[in-house]
């Protein structure tokens, strides 16, 4: 390019950077993010929302002059690109967007190795083509750049136009989704209407507000929550109340398990033959087919948190990571104080993952059997941790030495994304959808099913089965919306938003000594487990703050809230702002009579639970039935096999 030819001005470089970042954002909307965009208004909003913040941020560098102005513009553009791409990779794995809260979980990434790498796609270079071109120009073709300063008097005009565009965007968004910023729990809504960059700013503001909430919280805030939850309490079913008093309680966590696998055949073979038997109602287990996970960004940790506290996880981040130092009145601590239970958690991963080694102390959990208690040599490990069959076998040996009554929680790992399994461990062929995630899920789910059967048989041999309450549950979905096309091939039906909600059934099975099994079709969620167990143990719950209700109570609440503000009842589901019938998943145009009441209850539940966590409200509670847990009395020793990894 000769000196007579027109050079690239700083303003032209600014426009190029804004346009290319916006184009990449559009690309992510339609290729990587599942935002459920419908109609002219939503598509118009999608075209509009990336510009405002990108232009506002980059316009700051128009105040600079010389080559450094171009470099600052380049760095700013690269950081915005990196934010976009980080959200893309995160969304592929979690079907959610990055928040400031999730940055506290960055330590988990190293442990998740292969699962994260599986989230990279061949076409990801698209996100960085412009970055490489700009870098080439800045390093090798500086003569193409017009280093004259941009007229500073026009910079405020550019900034004002960016701000005006944001408010226009917000006006359109409020028209299509009223009270977007005040009553929306779903991050997908926020990104759809605001874009990923404005969402990051919004999340930063909410994070600051939540951090301030603890300092401003008072006993009055606790009283409001107690008054609300006490109105919701239900009477225990006299047929079940106290039937499991001082019985061992074993809780088995099935990683990433979804109940569409129950009675599902692939290539003529049952995927989960053992769980199929437990689900028949003919065994000693009662099966709840309409049991849903209620997790948020914390996924596995959220399921643990919700089931042991009858609280919901946070709208952003993991309660384990962000609120691990709070005061709690958890199920294991109550069982200890009321009936002398000793509690433990068993998991074939290391204790720092999800901040477990700290938060368990605040739950009053006595012992943590982490990876250092198991042989973690290469032959015993797959994907994220210890193979389930080895984990269950060793865990049963530990349990055989425990004094009754104990409360024991076993967390499996093999059926975890990206669902890889050693060939020697596979006993069923993969499905043939062409999607490695979905096809691998079939094999790892079968392996989990076999491991569970071996464990149950082991409990019988060791004399632990008959005297124990045994709970089994799926912690969260395994197959995200990103794999809907493959799921349609596997299930032979269209995966609509309503159908995807149905697929969030993760199942709950419970064996109660002295009770026969069956099938219970009540709609329920993980928040309902704690009050159920307390009533089975014969513990009066009137002074405990819980958002769930007893599964066996005749007054059990069948409105199941999800962390994003959607919900399902026994008759209909509310998904992405629309109501669908449970019978056929068809859209309901006439609003059900109890819809507004249920919607307000869900919003209130989530709001009140968030207040408990953000305000650390249990620190104010003088519960006559509970002595506050002293976390300093708990110490989790390193196990005898700490050096087994090779």
Swiss-Prot record:
Disulfide bonds: none
Segments in the Cytoplasmic topological domain: 1-7, 65-68, 141-153
Any one GO molecular-function label of the UniProt entry: transferase activity
Pathway where it operates: Cell wall biogenesis; lipoteichoic acid biosynthesis
Localization: Cell membrane
Bias (Basic and acidic residues): 623-638
Post-translational modification: Proteolytically cleaved.
GO cellular component terms, semicolon-separated: extracellular region; plasma membrane
EC number: 2.7.8.-
Active site: 300
Broad class of the protein's primary localization: membrane
Positions that bind substrate: 416
Gene Ontology biological process terms, A to Z: cell wall organization; lipoteichoic acid biosynthetic process
Residues that, per the record, bind Mn(2+): 255, 300, 475-476
SUPFAM superfamilies: Alkaline phosphatase-like
Keywords: Cell membrane, Cell wall biogenesis/degradation, Manganese, Membrane, Metal-binding, Secreted, Transferase, Transmembrane, Transmembrane helix
Transmembrane regions: 8-28, 44-64, 69-89, 120-140, 154-174
Region (Disordered): 623-646
Positions of the record's site feature: Cleavage: 217-218
Membrane topology: Multi-pass membrane protein
Described purpose of this protein according to its UniProt entry: Catalyzes the polymerization of lipoteichoic acid (LTA) polyglycerol phosphate, a reaction that presumably uses phosphatidylglycerol (PG) as substrate. Is required for staphylococcal growth and cell division process.
Listed name of the protein: Lipoteichoic acid synthase
Originating species: Staphylococcus aureus (strain bovine RF122 / ET3-1)
């Amino acid at each position: 390019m000769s000196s007579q030819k027109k050079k690239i001005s700083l303003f032209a470089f600014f426009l190029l950077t804004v346009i290319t970042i916006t184009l990449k954002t559009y690309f992510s909307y339609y290729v990587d993010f599942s935002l459920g965009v419908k109609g002219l208004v939503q598509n118009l909003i999608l075209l509009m929302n990336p510009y405002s913040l990108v232009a506002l941020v980059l316009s700051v560098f128009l105040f600079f002059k010389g080559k450094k102005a171009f470099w600052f513009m380049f760095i700013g553009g690269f950081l915005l690109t990196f934010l976009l791409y980080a959200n893309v990779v995160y969304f592929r794995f979690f079907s959610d967007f990055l928040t400031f809260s999730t940055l506290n979980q960055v330590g988990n990434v190293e442990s998740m190795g292969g699962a994260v790498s599986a989230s990279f796609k061949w076409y990801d270079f698209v996100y960085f083509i412009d970055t490489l071109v700009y870098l080439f120009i800045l390093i090798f073709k500086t003569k193409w750049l017009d280093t004259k300063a941009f007229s500073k008097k026009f910079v405020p005009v550019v900034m004002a136009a960016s701000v005006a565009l944001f408010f226009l965007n917000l006006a359109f968004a409020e028209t299509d989704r009223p009270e977007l910023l005040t009553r929306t729990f779903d991050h997908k809504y926020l990104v759809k209407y605001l874009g990923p960059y404005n969402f990051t700013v919004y999340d930063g503001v909410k994070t600051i507000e939540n951090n301030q909430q603890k300092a401003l919280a008072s006993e009055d805030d606790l009283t409001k929550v107690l008054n609300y939850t006490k109105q919701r309490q239900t009477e225990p079913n006299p047929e079940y109340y106290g039937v499991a008093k001082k019985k061992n309680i074993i809780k088995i966590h099935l990683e990433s398990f979804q109940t569409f696998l129950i009675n599902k055949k692939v290539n003529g073979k049952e995927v989960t033959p053992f769980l199929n038997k437990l689900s028949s109602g003919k065994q000693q287990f009662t099966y709840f087919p309409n049991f849903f996970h209620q997790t948020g960004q914390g996924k596995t940790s959220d399921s643990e948190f919700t089931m042991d506290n009858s609280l919901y996880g946070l709208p952003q981040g993991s309660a384990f990571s962000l609120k691990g130092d709070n005061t709690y009145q958890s199920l294991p601590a109550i069982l200890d104080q009321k009936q002398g239970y000793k509690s433990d958690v068993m998991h074939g991963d290391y204790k720092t993952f999800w901040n477990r080694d700290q938060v368990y102390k605040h739950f009053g959990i006595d012992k943590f059997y982490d990876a250092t208690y198991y042989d973690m040599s290469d032959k015993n490990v797959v994907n994220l941790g210890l193979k389930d069959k080895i984990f269950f076998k060793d865990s049963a040996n530990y349990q055989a030495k425990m004094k009754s009554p104990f409360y024991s929680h076993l967390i499996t790992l093999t059926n975890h994304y990206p669902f890889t399994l050693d060939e020697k461990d596979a006993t069923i062929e993969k499905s043939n959808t062409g999607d490695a995630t979905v096809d691998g899920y079939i094999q790892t789910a079968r392996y989990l099913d076999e491991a569970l059967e071996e464990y149950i048989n082991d409990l019988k041999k060791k004399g632990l089965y008959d005297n124990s309450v045994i709970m089994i549950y799926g912690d969260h979905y395994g197959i995200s919306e990103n794999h809907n096309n493959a799921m349609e091939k596997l299930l032979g039906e269209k995966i609509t938003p309503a159908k995807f909600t149905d697929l969030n059934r993760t199942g709950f099975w419970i064996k109660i000594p002295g009770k026969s099994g069956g099938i219970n079709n009540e709609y329920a969620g993980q928040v309902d487990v704690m009050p159920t167990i307390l009533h089975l143990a014969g513990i009066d719950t009137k002074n405990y703050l819980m958002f769930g209700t007893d599964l066996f109570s005749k007054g059990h609440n069948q409105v199941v809230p999800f962390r994003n503000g959607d919900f399902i009842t026994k008759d209909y589901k509310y998904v992405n702002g629309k109501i669908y019938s449970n019978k056929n998943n068809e859209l309901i145009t006439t609003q059900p009579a109890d819809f507004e009441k249920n919607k307000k209850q869900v919003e209130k539940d989530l709001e009140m639970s968030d207040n408990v966590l953000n305000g650390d409200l249990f620190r104010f509670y003088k519960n006559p039935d509970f002595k506050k847990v002293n976390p300093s009395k708990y110490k989790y020793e390193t196990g005898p096999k700490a050096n087994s990894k090779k």
